[in-house]
Amino acid sequence: MKTGLVLEGGAMRGIYTAGVLDVFMEQGLHFDGVIGVSAGALHGCSFVSGQKGRSIRYFKKYRNDKHFMSMWNLVHTGEVVGKQLCYHDIPERLDPYDYEAFLKSDTEFYATCSNVETGKAEYIKITDMLNQIDVLRASASMPYVSKLVDYQGMKLLDGGCTDSIPLEAFRRMGFEKNVVILTQHKGYVKKPQNAKMAELRYHKYCLLYTSDAADE
């Protein structure tokens, strides 16, 4: 029976997930597969590479940098998260991501993204973090404050738009015994999205905000 780890997103709340994953690493816990959504994917990749403390460390160091995540970024680049700092400067040199350890890991890693043209979730397997960094970026590209990410002919946004807790999807992939880390309180029910706002912002992609697509 394959074991899986399912990581909900939640922007800044995701730092809770990072702490739980650090404890898992301290205890030597291993999973056959990890699937993350948005912030869950961002922190989950450091779990797969075995870099305990990395997520919390770089978050604490750069959280107040305007190039990390800020309204300044949004005004000047059209995206609230700084692409260059977060997806290149930090993992490549400032707080290096262990790409080699990720490549050698026997844990399968998936990032959940939303395909704005189909209105459905895409569960994309990442085998080479350096060359597939745009998948990770797409998974965490929050709606309204991020640009669409083009990847292999798909236009992608934050995975939370279509499947914020991809437990059933992971089960269908063969991961039958799962641990799920949530970033909302027990009993939380996600409110329906504002269809009018979504229509104004994503009028070219009606399947992203229609109820039929969301229910599938």
Please state what every model-predicted region is.
Residues 1-37, 45-211:
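Patatin-like phospholipase
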Residues 212-216:
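A short, hydrophobic C-terminal helix/tail in secreted or cell-surface proteins
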